[in-house]
């Protein structure tokens, strides 16, 4: 059977680093207040010359180089983002142009913080269906552009950045020892829309709008929803939490990460945490954390990696893959 195997990985972050103490002159908050509630200490904020497309392109180039490929080897460019450069065309098409790719196809996916999980799942389906041999999967965001900088409950949480994977078709044996995507489960429930959303859009207010969130409500639902899709992936494969080498969760809030790992009985030492240095980068969160753990030598070939995320909608999902 065909598996979607990770061939390369890359990431990109804006030059500017904004520490918690930098907020003290903007809103009523403190480093202690932010760290205690979120685990975040700093985040990267895009400058005027940095966009979702420029960050996504940089991460894509790094992933392609890491894979030992050329941009022209890519069949599909799939971008997960909620902060595109334009309403249309898709920012994936702009990244495709920047990379010099003129064949194949490209499109955006919007599932907010779950976007990268949705994108990997979609890429896997295209690969296993024979429509693409190599897919560039990107998560890129400039959430700083949709924040209300007077709302201390949200503006301290988010950062900007991008991460990318090259997924490639490879022959597998149909076993959980195969490299590549082993299972993926996605969910959504629009009844929770008002708990996490942006209060603008071209068809309603003709504005970009700002992010609005009921933090306590999100936290209340997060752990149960996340563990539900993970357990579905375990059931599908016959694997268990004990088999996991690395748990790479969406980096939204350290309390949610800790609670999810505890409920799943995943040891603290197996959890990849980058929320302290990146904040919540939405669809870029998981690939940035992955890239960090690969670069520092934690994630190695053959490791079983569990990815998960939850975002506005609500949307949520999990992917099991062997590196």
From Swiss-Prot:
Enzyme kind, highest EC tier: transferase
Region annotation ACP-binding: where it falls in the sequence: 251-255
Alphabetical list of InterPro entries matching this protein: ACP_syn_III_C, ACP_syn_III_N, FabH, Thiolase-like
EC number, as in UniProt: 2.3.1.180
Catalytic reactions of this protein: malonyl-[ACP] + acetyl-CoA + H(+) = 3-oxobutanoyl-[ACP] + CO2 + CoA
Active-site residues, record numbering mapped to chain: 113, 250, 280
Location of this chain's protein in the cell: Cytoplasm
Record-level GO cellular component terms: cytoplasm
Molecular function per GO: 3-oxoacyl-[acyl-carrier-protein] synthase activity; beta-ketoacyl-acyl-carrier-protein synthase III activity
GO terms under biological process: fatty acid biosynthetic process
Pfam families, alphabetized: ACP_syn_III, ACP_syn_III_C
Secreted among keywords: no
Pathway(s) served: Lipid metabolism; fatty acid biosynthesis
Tagged with keyword Lyase: no
Record keywords, A-Z: Acyltransferase, Cytoplasm, Fatty acid biosynthesis, Fatty acid metabolism, Lipid biosynthesis, Lipid metabolism, Multifunctional enzyme, Transferase
Matches recorded under PANTHER family: 3-OXOACYL-[ACYL-CARRIER-PROTEIN] SYNTHASE (PTHR43091), BETA-KETOACYL-[ACYL-CARRIER-PROTEIN] SYNTHASE III, CHLOROPLASTIC (PTHR43091:SF1)
Domain notes from UniProt: The last Arg residue of the ACP-binding site is essential for the weak association between ACP/AcpP and FabH.
Function: Catalyzes the condensation reaction of fatty acid synthesis by the addition to an acyl acceptor of two carbons from malonyl-ACP. Catalyzes the first condensation reaction which initiates fatty acid synthesis and may therefore play a role in governing the total rate of fatty acid production. Possesses both acetoacetyl-ACP synthase and acetyl transacylase activities. Its substrate specificity determines the biosynthesis of branched-chain and/or straight-chain of fatty acids.
NCBIfam families found in the cross-reference section: fabH, PRK09352.1
Assembly notes: Homodimer.
Family according to the record: Belongs to the thiolase-like superfamily. FabH family.
Name the record gives this protein: Beta-ketoacyl-[acyl-carrier-protein] synthase III
Native species: Brucella anthropi (strain ATCC 49188 / DSM 6882 / CCUG 24695 / JCM 21032 / LMG 3331 / NBRC 15819 / NCTC 12168 / Alc 37) (Ochrobactrum anthropi)
